[in-house]
């Protein structure tokens, strides 16, 4: 008997035996088996079978025999023999075996047992008319398995396999569960053309992640439902297969192959009525291929080649190259359909089409300007992802954030309400007291309570506005639901219902929705923000990229017009350099070549004159953050073998997985100033790499990824020829000598690709005095954190400028002088307790230097 049982039948008998042992029953009865069948794992097929017969969930039947188990005789003791099948159970198994033989089945399945067990285990007080008869169960069983025979020990997983492992896109389209598909007409038409072929009618959608490959398939499903397809595709079902669900739970060898074979058989038996879709098509290569088993790709090949299986696949360019192209026999059975990234204008159109769905889901309004901002800002600032997916995510997150703010009570209202509740409890306690002090406290408390209740009443409009907004959201949801009902009624030919909806209820709801915003517009002072605007989109972009939201919306022209003034505040004595950089950045922003960096400069000059400071000021001005500067010391790249560190080690070398120092930094922060310090010390191979960046605005790293440099400003610094700049020769002669040195050191093709060569002049004493003022102001800000004030006399400032002046070293000696003459002395006085928090520190000129101490009075 064991040899003829399926795995689940054997498990059910073992579970029934265990149940009988735990209950102390000496006999194994049909009631034990029925309970084991209906309460066991993986019993969906039996529950569905009972539900089909009884027209109700099958779980109700599982409770009936459990009540009758208590009436069975029980035994106790340590030498109790294991329970044996009684006469009724043996008759059930024999009857099930006969039925299996009559049906041509090779194994005894759980369904055979259920058909045989049902009459003998009928619960007490259950009328014969309500209990399913064996004939009804047998009829339902034959309908469920669709004429297939039980020829394996695991047949239960093969019934309704397509329903279990697939999602019907056409059914979802009929129920309006799919988002509308805007555009993509050319791609959908191409898919229809391939599907209409006689053989190899299998299109594969290839494109970057997020460009809308699955949306093309959803658009095809919607067209099939509307009948907007050729005759060869009319009334077809588009079913998405879930390979992950097929692999999941396949415990035994060959179980995955059986599941897939059953699905393919169902598709074949549909006689071309089913078109399948596999998202992430590359997963079929190797899926289920454990222990030398055949993978899904090899099982699909014969049907794909003969045209028995019409399949639509979707995968990314990289995965297609790495997985599908390596199997030419599989690749030739598919026809490529490229899905390109839509333009910003097309993305805005897509967002407008989806706007209603997101408004209904989040119950907020979404301004059209927010949609435009989402498409433009995501295209400009989120370069690692693709439209329209990134723009849709921006709108979704901004609407979600606004919904969360609406649902959350404002902090001040919440605190007011809590304080009112606390004061009311105090009032009840004080009201019982009779002494004068308590009565006085009670009067004061009641006055305070009245004030707070008035404040709470002033905030009640917030609740009213919130309720009104929720009502608008409910109206939108209802409107969306009615439109779906009208669409389904038209598809089924119920024009009476469709006309009632289209010309009755829907126009009424639309009027209500138009009237409510007009009413709310009249009341300008609203406490609840109900519309997603460009500011909200910019906030989300800022949280994703780290770029401040205010700068995202500020006009480029306004920002760049004040560039010299902003940079000039930080950089003293280099007006020509500031002017040259500002002009170059403005020119590139105005008539920008989209395939080059925003700016590329070579800063030349002696040490300490502000080359690095200008790069920091650029990062702060353009990106609101000094840390938006990627600084690489080129003296570390003087050896030939170290050049590869910039872009990452090639495959097979140590450090391949880590990426490049330059490429990884720019990939993580594409909007930044890249400072390559002391570039003349780098190996000549570095400049060959930089040629590609300066010319094309892109660089390929060691792992084959293309890194975008188009939004960076490239700054290279060098001390070449600085000895000529500190001399007394005329300015033009100095510049000529510097340029001769530069031309002899760098290749012409490198210099020719730079936007500008900026020469920094040496600082004079007046400029150093102004720099001293900036340094002192920085020290004062640091002292303010300790609540100390700094007062430096003009005489002390002049002494600092004079003593710190050294044309050969620029402003760095001044910084060291301020640290030693003021900073170090002040630190000693703070540690000694001579200067305390809140004091004013005075710095004055004396004969032998500076006097630093606490100001008197």
From Swiss-Prot:
CDD domains: AAA, RecA-like_ClpB_Hsp104-like. Belongs to the ClpA/ClpB family. Residues 1-147 form the Clp R domain. SUPFAM superfamilies: Double Clp-N motif, P-loop containing nucleoside triphosphate hydrolases. It is found in: Cytoplasm. This is Chaperone protein ClpB. One of its GO terms (biological process) is cellular response to heat. Residues 556-762 are annotated as: NBD2. Residues 56-83 are annotated as: Disordered. Keywords: ATP-binding, Chaperone, Coiled coil, Cytoplasm, Nucleotide-binding, Repeat, Stress response. Disulfide bonds: none annotated. The keyword Chaperone applies. Residues 85-147 are annotated as: Repeat 2. Residues 342-546 are annotated as: Linker. One of its GO terms (cellular component) is cytoplasm. PROSITE patterns: CLP_R (PS51903), CLPAB_1 (PS00870), CLPAB_2 (PS00871). ATP 1 binds at residues 207-214. Residues 392-525 form a coiled coil. Homohexamer. The oligomerization is ATP-dependent.
């Amino acid at each position: 008997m064991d040899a003829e049982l399926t795995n689940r039948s054997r498990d059910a008998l073992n579970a029934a035996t265990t149940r009988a042992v735990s209950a102390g029953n000496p006999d194994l009865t049909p009631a034990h088996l029925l309970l084991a069948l209906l309460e066991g794992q993986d019993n969906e097929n039996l529950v569905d079978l009972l539900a089909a017969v009884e027209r109700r969930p099958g779980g109700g039947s599982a409770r009936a025999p459990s009540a009758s188990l208590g009436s069975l005789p029980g035994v106790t003791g340590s030498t109790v023999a294991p329970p044996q099948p009684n006469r009724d159970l043996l008759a059930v198994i024999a009857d099930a075996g006969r039925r299996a033989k009559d049906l041509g089945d090779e194994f005894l399945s759980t369904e055979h047992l259920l058909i045989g067990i049902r009459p003998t285990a009928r619960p007490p007080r259950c009328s014969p008319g309500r209990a399913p008869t064996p004939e009804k169960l047998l009829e339902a069983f034959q309908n469920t398995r669709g004429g297939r025979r039980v020829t394996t020990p695991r047949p239960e997983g093969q019934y309704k396999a397509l329903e279990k492992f697939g999602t019907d896109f056409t059914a979802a389209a009929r129920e309006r569960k799919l988002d509308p598909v805007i555009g993509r007409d050319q791609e959908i038409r191409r898919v229809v053309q391939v599907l209409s072929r006689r053989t190899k009618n299998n299109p594969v959608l290839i494109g970057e992640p997020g460009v809308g490959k699955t949306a093309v398939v959803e658009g095809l499903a919607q067209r099939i439902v509307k009948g907007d397809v050729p005759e060869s595709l009319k009334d077809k079902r588009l079913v998405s297969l879930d390979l992950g669900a097929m692999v999941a739970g396949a415990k035994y060898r060959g179980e995955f192959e059986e599941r897939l074979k059953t699905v393919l058989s169902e598709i074949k038996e549909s006689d071309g009525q089913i078109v399948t879709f596999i998202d992430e098509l590359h997963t079929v290569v190797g899926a289920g291929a454990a222990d030398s088993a055949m993978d899904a790709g090899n099982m699909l090949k014969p049907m794909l080649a003969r045209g028995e299986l019409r399949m639509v696949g979707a995968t990314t360019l990289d995965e297609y190259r790495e997985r599908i192209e390596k199997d030419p026999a599989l690749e030739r059975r598919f026809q490529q359909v490229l899905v390109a990234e839509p333009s910003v204008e097309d993305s805005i159109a897509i967002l407008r089409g989806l706007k209603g769905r997101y408004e209904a889901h989040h119950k907020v309004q979404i301004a059209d300007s927010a949609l435009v901002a989402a498409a433009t800002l995501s295209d400009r600032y989120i370069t690692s992802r693709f439209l329209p997916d990134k723009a849709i995510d921006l709108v979704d997150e901004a609407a979600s954030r606004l919904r969360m703010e609406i649902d959350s009570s404002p902090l001040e209202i919440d605190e007011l309400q809590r304080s009112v509740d606390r004061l009311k409890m105090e009032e009840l306690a004080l009201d019982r007291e009779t002494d004068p002090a308590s009565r006085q406290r009670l009067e004061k408390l009641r006055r305070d309570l009245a004030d707070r209740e008035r404040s709470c009443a002033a905030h009640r409009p917030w609740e009213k506005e919130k309720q009104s907004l929720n009502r608008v959201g409910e109206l939108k949801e209802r409107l969306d639901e009615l439109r779906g009902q009208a669409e389904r009624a038209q598809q089924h030919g119920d024009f009476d219902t469709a006309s009632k909806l289209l010309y009755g209820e829907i126009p009424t709801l639309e009027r209500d929705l138009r009237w409510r915003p007009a009413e709310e517009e009249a009341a300008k002072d609203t406490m609840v923000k109900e519309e997603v605007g460009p500011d909200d989109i910019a906030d989300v972009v800022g949280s994703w990229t780290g770029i401040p939201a205010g700068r995202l919306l500020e006009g480029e022209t306004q920002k760049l017009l004040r560039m010299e003034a902003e940079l000039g505040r930080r950089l003293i004595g280099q007006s020509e350099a500031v002017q040259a950089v500002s002009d170059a950045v403005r020119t590139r922003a105005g008539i920008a070549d989209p395939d080059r960096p925003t700016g590329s400069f070579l800063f030349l000059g002696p040490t300490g004159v502000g080359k690095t400071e200008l790069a920091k000021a650029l990062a702060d001005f353009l990106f609101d953050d000094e840390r938006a500067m990627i600084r690489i010391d080129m003296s570390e790249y003087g050896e030939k073998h170290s050049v590869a560190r910039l872009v990452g080690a090639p495959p097979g070398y140590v450090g391949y997985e880590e990426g490049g120092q330059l490429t990884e930094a720019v990939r993580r922060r594409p909007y930044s100033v890249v400072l390559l310090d002391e570039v003349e010390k780098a190996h000549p191979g570095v400049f060959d790499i930089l040629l590609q960046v300066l010319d094309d605005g892109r660089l390929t790293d060691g792992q084959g990824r293309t890194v975008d440099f188009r939004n960076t400003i490239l700054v290279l610094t060098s001390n070449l020829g600085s000895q000529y700049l500190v001399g007394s020769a005329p300015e033009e002669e100095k510049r000529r000598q510097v340029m001769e040195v530069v031309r002899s050191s760098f290749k012409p093709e490198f210099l020719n690709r730079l936007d500008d060569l900026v020469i920094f002049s040496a600082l004079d004493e007046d400029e150093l005095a102004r720099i001293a003022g900036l340094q002192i102001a920085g020290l004062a800000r640091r002292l303010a954190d300790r609540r100390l004030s700094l007062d430096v006399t003009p005489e002390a400032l002049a002494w600092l400028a004079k003593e710190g002046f050294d044309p050969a070293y620029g402003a760095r000696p001044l910084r060291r002088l301020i640290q030693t003459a003021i900073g170090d002395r002040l630190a000693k006085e703070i540690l000694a307790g001579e200067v305390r928090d809140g004091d004013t520190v005075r710095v004055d000129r004396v004969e032998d230097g500076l006097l630093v101490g606490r100001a008197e009075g």
